[in-house]
């Protein structure tokens, strides 16, 4: 895989999509026959496909050793994409020692949904509180607070149609 020049700033969604598209086009996410780059006598690079027999021999050797690679990525490609940081995606040359935890919980989930997780002091990656729930008796039905926090007047009667 050969990379194109990217600006050294923050990676945009388009550049990440382009990176993923490059991986897919190179057959990394599909089980295609691997390609190798070879130099000819005049110094130009050409793409050489491994034969099916070589690929099958490598696959059977890996299976005997108990190693089944999911993805084959060139290390240089990973070094070029180090700038990308996300809590959900990690580009690395090394395989992880164990799968990541789905939730970072210290105790069982509380059934009371009205309490905010921020108040409990626990962090759950990927989970964000939308709003605080407030439970109280309504005594004044003529005014309310809208979703933007503004005080609004509640209409006592709404007329519909011709009257």
UniProtKB/Swiss-Prot annotation:
<dbReference type="Pfam" id="PF00243">
    <property type="entry name" value="NGF"/>
</dbReference>
<dbReference type="GO" id="GO:0008021">
    <property type="term" value="C:synaptic vesicle"/>
</dbReference>
<feature type="signal peptide">
    <location>
        <begin position="1"/>
        <end position="3"/>
    </location>
</feature>
<dbReference type="GO" id="GO:0048812">
    <property type="term" value="P:neuron projection morphogenesis"/>
</dbReference>
<dbReference type="InterPro" id="IPR045815">
    <property type="entry name" value="NTF3_N"/>
</dbReference>
<dbReference type="GO" id="GO:0038180">
    <property type="term" value="P:nerve growth factor signaling pathway"/>
</dbReference>
<dbReference type="InterPro" id="IPR002072">
    <property type="entry name" value="Nerve_growth_factor-rel"/>
</dbReference>
<dbReference type="GO" id="GO:0050804">
    <property type="term" value="P:modulation of chemical synaptic transmission"/>
</dbReference>
<dbReference type="GO" id="GO:0005615">
    <property type="term" value="C:extracellular space"/>
</dbReference>
<protein>
    <recommendedName>
        <fullName>Neurotrophin-3</fullName>
    </recommendedName>
</protein>
<dbReference type="GO" id="GO:0030424">
    <property type="term" value="C:axon"/>
</dbReference>
<keyword id="KW-0165">Cleavage on pair of basic residues</keyword>
<dbReference type="GO" id="GO:0005163">
    <property type="term" value="F:nerve growth factor receptor binding"/>
</dbReference>
<comment type="similarity">
    <text>Belongs to the NGF-beta family.</text>
</comment>
<keyword id="KW-0339">Growth factor</keyword>
<dbReference type="GO" id="GO:0008083">
    <property type="term" value="F:growth factor activity"/>
</dbReference>
<keyword id="KW-0732">Signal</keyword>
<dbReference type="InterPro" id="IPR029034">
    <property type="entry name" value="Cystine-knot_cytokine"/>
</dbReference>
<dbReference type="InterPro" id="IPR020408">
    <property type="entry name" value="Nerve_growth_factor-like"/>
</dbReference>
<feature type="glycosylation site" description="N-linked (GlcNAc...) asparagine">
    <location>
        <position position="112"/>
    </location>
</feature>
<keyword id="KW-0964">Secreted</keyword>
<comment type="function">
    <text>Seems to promote the survival of visceral and proprioceptive sensory neurons.</text>
</comment>
<dbReference type="GO" id="GO:0007169">
    <property type="term" value="P:cell surface receptor protein tyrosine kinase signaling pathway"/>
</dbReference>
<feature type="propeptide">
    <location>
        <begin position="4"/>
        <end position="119"/>
    </location>
</feature>
<dbReference type="InterPro" id="IPR015578">
    <property type="entry name" value="Neurotrophin-3"/>
</dbReference>
<dbReference type="Pfam" id="PF19338">
    <property type="entry name" value="NTF3_N"/>
</dbReference>
<keyword id="KW-0325">Glycoprotein</keyword>
<dbReference type="GO" id="GO:0030425">
    <property type="term" value="C:dendrite"/>
</dbReference>
<dbReference type="GO" id="GO:0021675">
    <property type="term" value="P:nerve development"/>
</dbReference>
<dbReference type="GO" id="GO:0043524">
    <property type="term" value="P:negative regulation of neuron apoptotic process"/>
</dbReference>
């Amino acid at each position: 895989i050969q990379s194109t020049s990217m600006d050294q700033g923050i990676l945009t969604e388009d550049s990440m999509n382009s990176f993923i598209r490059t991986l897919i086009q190179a057959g990394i996410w599909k089980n295609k026959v691997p390609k190798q780059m070879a130099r000819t006598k005049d110094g130009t690079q050409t793409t050489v496909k491994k034969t099916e027999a070589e690929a099958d021999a490598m696959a059977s050797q890996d299976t005997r050793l108990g190693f089944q690679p999911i993805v084959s990525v060139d290390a240089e490609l990973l070094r070029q994409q180090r700038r990308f940081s996300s809590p959900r995606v990690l580009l690395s040359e090394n395989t992880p020692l164990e799968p990541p935890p789905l939730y970072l919980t210290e105790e069982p989930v509380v059934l009371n949904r009205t309490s905010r997780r921020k108040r409990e002091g626990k962090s759950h990656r990927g989970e964000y509180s939308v709003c605080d729930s407030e439970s109280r008796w309504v005594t004044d039905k003529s005014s309310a607070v809208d979703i933007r926090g503004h005080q609004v007047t509640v209409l006592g009667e709404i007329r519909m149609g011709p009257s």
